[in-house]
């Protein structure tokens, strides 16, 4: 399964919404995600992709759309 599909599935589980047709949907300003869903999503991303997301370096602007999530996961995988 590719990263994009896995992230869409993780977001669907965390938010109850399907982003497969709208990968540029703003997650925070639209109210879809809050701090609790963010923590849940980050923990799942770390477990699924065997990456570490330093909370101190987490910037919502870098993680605020499904496409940006894909970019950040790929970036972290390259660093690991």
From Swiss-Prot:
Keywords: Cell wall biogenesis/degradation, Cytoplasm, Phosphopantetheine, Phosphoprotein. It is found in: Cytoplasm. One of its GO terms (biological process) is cell wall organization. GO terms for molecular function: D-alanyl carrier activity. Residues 1-77 form the Carrier domain. SUPFAM superfamilies: ACP-like. Transmembrane segments: none annotated. The modification O-(pantetheine 4'-phosphoryl)serine is found at residue 35. One of its GO terms (cellular component) is cytoplasm. Pathway: Cell wall biogenesis; lipoteichoic acid biosynthesis. 4'-phosphopantetheine is transferred from CoA to a specific serine of apo-DCP. Carrier protein involved in the D-alanylation of lipoteichoic acid (LTA). The loading of thioester-linked D-alanine onto DltC is catalyzed by D-alanine--D-alanyl carrier protein ligase DltA. The DltC-carried D-alanyl group is further transferred to cell membrane phosphatidylglycerol (PG) by forming an ester bond, probably catalyzed by DltD. D-alanylation of LTA plays an important role in modulating the properties of the cell wall in Gram-positive bacteria, influencing the net charge of the cell wall. Belongs to the DltC family. This is D-alanyl carrier protein. It comes from Lactobacillus delbrueckii subsp. bulgaricus (strain ATCC 11842 / DSM 20081 / BCRC 10696 / JCM 1002 / NBRC 13953 / NCIMB 11778 / NCTC 12712 / WDCM 00102 / Lb 14).
């Amino acid at each position: 399964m590719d990263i994009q599909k896995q992230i869409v599935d993780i977001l669907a589980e965390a938010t109850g919404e399907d982003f497969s047709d709208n990968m540029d949907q703003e997650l925070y300003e639209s109210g879809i995600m809050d701090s609790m869903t963010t923590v849940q999503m980050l923990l799942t991303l770390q477990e699924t992709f065997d990456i570490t997301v330093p909370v101190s370096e987490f910037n919502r602007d870098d993680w605020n759309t499904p496409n940006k999530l894909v970019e950040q996961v790929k970036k972290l995988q390259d660093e690991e």
